[in-house]
Amino acid sequence: MAAAKDTHEDHDTSTENADESNHDPQFEPIVSLPEQEIKTLEEDEEELFKMRAKLFRFASENDLPEWKERGTGDVKLLKHKEKGTIRLLMRRDKTLKICANHYITPMMELKPNAGSDRAWVWNTHADFADECPKQELLAIRFLNAENAQKFKTKFEECRKEIEEKEKKGSGKNDSTEKVVEKLEALSVQEGEQPQDAAPAAVEEEQ
């Protein structure tokens, strides 16, 4: 009897295991949402530089101003394919939240951080990390001095490229203004009569 009972229990156990292995629950969502493509605006830009770093901002609004860590992630230099503008973009790891987002301008200057050969400090008048433009004093630190130098080299290349672009743009504007001035002067001269023309006409009529 004991052997028969054990055999029966083994059969029940194997049956339960078989049922569990065959059981494949599928949960259908209550509401099916269509997949949406999320654009980051990076689709229209060319990646010129990418490197891992840590970003800081100077919290001057605090009672005791100090450097605050903004996040660690990949810092990128991105050039717009049509407009030619170049911006610095950095997102935090995992969350991908933006911690730096501003255009490179000719006036920007990377300055070495005191006591470190792998960190730079610079000012930006309009950083859009918090969506609203805000003036910030930022600092970025790399793994080593070599990486920091690579960033500076590319940053300077971008800054000079934007500077040249703006010079060409201002030159075109100056040329356009000169052409307009000449056309205006020409139209005025055509509309004016010589001073001796009027008396001559009067004499002929007499």
UniProtKB/Swiss-Prot annotation:
Q: State the source organism's domain of life.
A: Eukaryota
Q: Where is the RanBD1 domain?
A: 26-164
Tell me which Pfam families the record gives. Answer: Ran_BP1
One GO term (biological process): nucleocytoplasmic transport
Record's keyword terms, sorted: Acetylation, GTPase activation, Phosphoprotein
Positions of region (Disordered): 1-33, 162-206
In this UniProt entry, the residues modified to Phosphothreonine are 13
- Annotated positions of the N6-acetyllysine modification: 150, 182
Function, in words: Plays a role in RAN-dependent nucleocytoplasmic transport. Alleviates the TNPO1-dependent inhibition of RAN GTPase activity and mediates the dissociation of RAN from proteins involved in transport into the nucleus. Induces a conformation change in the complex formed by XPO1 and RAN that triggers the release of the nuclear export signal of cargo proteins. Promotes the disassembly of the complex formed by RAN and importin beta. Promotes dissociation of RAN from a complex with KPNA2 and CSE1L. Required for normal mitotic spindle assembly and normal progress through mitosis via its effect on RAN.
* Name assigned to this protein: Ran-specific GTPase-activating protein
Natural source organism: Bos taurus (Bovine)
Highest classification ranks of the organism? Eukaryota, Metazoa, Chordata, Craniata, Vertebrata
